[in-house]
Amino acid sequence: KMVENVDGVGEFLEDLKKNTFQKYDAFTVGEVFNMKADELGQFIGDNGHFSTIFDFCAHSLSDGAHGWYDAPHVDFKTWRDTILSSQINVQKYGLEANIIENHDEPRGVSHYIPESDVSDTSKKMLAAVNVMLRGLPFIYQGQELGMTNVYFDKLEDYRDIESINFFTELTESGLMTPEYMMKCLMLRSRDNARTPMQWDDSKQAGFTEGEPWICLLYTSPSPRDLSTS
């Protein structure tokens, strides 16, 4: 909110564009949140601050009123209609960068596909949506393998400070039980997409010969079942 409400941010971005990116005809991608409906043309297009920006329309569907613990389930029809609306709207100005997941979001396979429907076919369909939309598909590491959430069942396995603080505050205040909060973290924690890339079925999935900063994806599919090799 501090950045959103400060006058002159647009002028600063224009100065940045003029004196850096524009000199080299550089392609730029912005990350913009809480943008008003009539502001898209200020950020992309011929006169925009950036060449394009990430489209977070689908991700905003799982924003709870108070955080993760009351985040709503992503309904398929709402998800479909939201993406379609965004695609139509952006055509007036240019194109956007389409994403399914990133380092701050849970894995798309676990987030958008009902657990009972997760399969190679449904994973490929989700990938097809991302690459066939108008715009630029951005692929996050592990997404090309169909990696899922990690589903850590112990708080000690998490490294994301937001996840740890969120769990601690809500359980110590008595607002939520530890069991409920663990389920929330399994679904929404940023650590779900921050586990090491799985290269093969060797120790540590071929990512390192040492100990990684965080556990591997140790539930099904395991590194033996899901790796680049």
Model regions: which residues?
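Active-site and adjacent substrate-binding regions of carbohydrate-active enzymes
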Residues: 1-220, 224, 229
